[in-house]
Amino acid sequence: MARVKRGVIARKRHKKILKLAKGYYGARSRVFRVAKQAVIKAGQYAYRDRRQKKRQFRALWIARINAGARNNGLSYSRLIAGLKKASIEIDRKVLADLAVNEKAAFAAIVEKAKATLA
């Protein structure tokens, strides 16, 4: 059986990694050995941050809802408790959007929560 040298396979592997590293600074986009490490690290960051993104957005929504609720004389925790009691099922993403863009609608929701708590 004929001996197969790895030229074609190695070139393909290198091109794939260097393509993924396109736009990286300095040797990270040109030297295979460095580029491979950079691509692996980038993948680790991407994996981790896809999970962190969900936590960070939830925290942002809560901060916005809290600010809007306090402008209407209620704390975040009291607002959420009031909404649960009133059986109003609006998720935090929508509540945050209302608090920022539709202040009148958000105020009406807060008033319903207040009425349920009283």
UniProtKB/Swiss-Prot annotation:
SUPFAM superfamilies: Ribosomal protein L20. Binds directly to 23S ribosomal RNA and is necessary for the in vitro assembly process of the 50S ribosomal subunit. It is not involved in the protein synthesizing functions of that subunit. NCBIfam families: rplT_bact (TIGR01032). This is Large ribosomal subunit protein bL20. The gene is rplT. It holds the Pfam family Ribosomal_L20. GO terms for cellular component: ribonucleoprotein complex; ribosome. It comes from the Bacteria. GO terms for biological process: ribosomal large subunit assembly; translation. Keywords: Ribonucleoprotein, Ribosomal protein, RNA-binding, rRNA-binding.
